[in-house]
Amino acid sequence: MSSLAIRYHQYGKLQECLVAEEVSLPEIEPDQVHIKLLAASINPSDFGMIMGSYGQKKELPAVAGREGVGEIIEIGKNVNHLKPGQWVQFPESLGTWQEACVIDAEGLKVLPEGLPIEMAATLFINPPTAWRLLHDFVELKSGDWIIQNAANSAVGIFVIQLAKKLGIKTLNIVRRKELKEKLKELGADEVFSEEEEYWKTGPEITGGKGIKLALNSVGGESAINLIKGLSPGGTHVTFGAMSFEPIRFPTRQLIFGDIKLAGFWIDSWMRSHSQKEVDTQFENIYALIKEGTFSTIVEKWYSLSAFKEALEHAAQPRFGKILFRGEE
């Protein structure tokens, strides 16, 4: 058996490092399963992994991709808790940008029936990140305000969707003005572009309530402006650095505004919490999908063989996810 896989043999720029290769799959052992890829996502963290700047480096050569959904097509003779046809989380440890894999059956996450394929493919990073950002740092209640940059990112959209359900008001920052109406259609309360001095009008926008929580995934000047928009005693959480620019935090706000700084990485949260807590997290997400609160916006699907075009598209300004579809 063989499988098409998008691999890298060294760390560096995506277009220079990634190659499509046919890799041999091992014969299935009694305690293993054979999984075919249904769909996989392209995330900013994938770029960082390939460049060697994100998380823990993999042993090379490595298959790219951190997130995806697969279907079990064969089980080993000792496997009795799984069956062909079930959807499972495609193993991140093996890389998700490949047509198929063979892996131990123990520990595979089985997905509930009825999930839209685009939601199943984007389930494991951004939805739990959005949930934790709104639940773990500040006690928020209906009517409270938060502010976030990169509001059109996958996490940003999930934050808007979840905040709307919880009654939390969102002040959203984007780079392109044409995205304002699209985000408002999703439930965003206020949307500003980066060049607008939104931090000066915060009290007016919020009716004097102020802003308790800032969510930063950009860095640089954008992150600093979020701090300026926070109310005294507010919390600023950084969970990404898409601009690759350092943050020079304004001393005045830190000292006299009593601003609190925090960082967040969903991988660390998953590792530091019990399996029961992780399972509960995903049960909450499944419920939000079922009721229609969470949905993934897709801009375009690509085959794995068209990975170069897919990555070029993913690196451009857009509204929605770029996804890989597995072969039929």
Predicted regions and their residues:
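C-terminal capping/lid region of NAD(P)-dependent oxidoreductase domains
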Residues: 3, 286, 291-297, 308-328
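Glycine-rich beta-strand-centered segment in the early N-terminal region that forms part
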Residues: 24-41, 51-95
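NAD(P)H dinucleotide-binding glycine-rich loop of Rossmann-like/cofactor-binding domains
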Residues: 87-150
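N-terminal Rossmann-like NAD(P) cofactor-binding module of classical short-chain dehydrogenase/reductase
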Residues: 89, 147, 212-215, 237
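Mid-domain Rossmann-like dinucleotide-binding core that forms the NAD(H)/NADP(H) cofactor-binding site
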Residues: 123-196
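Short amphipathic alpha-helix with an adjacent loop that forms part of the alpha/beta core around
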Residues: 198-209
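Glycine-rich phosphate-binding loop and adjacent beta-alpha segment
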Residues: 221-293, 325-328
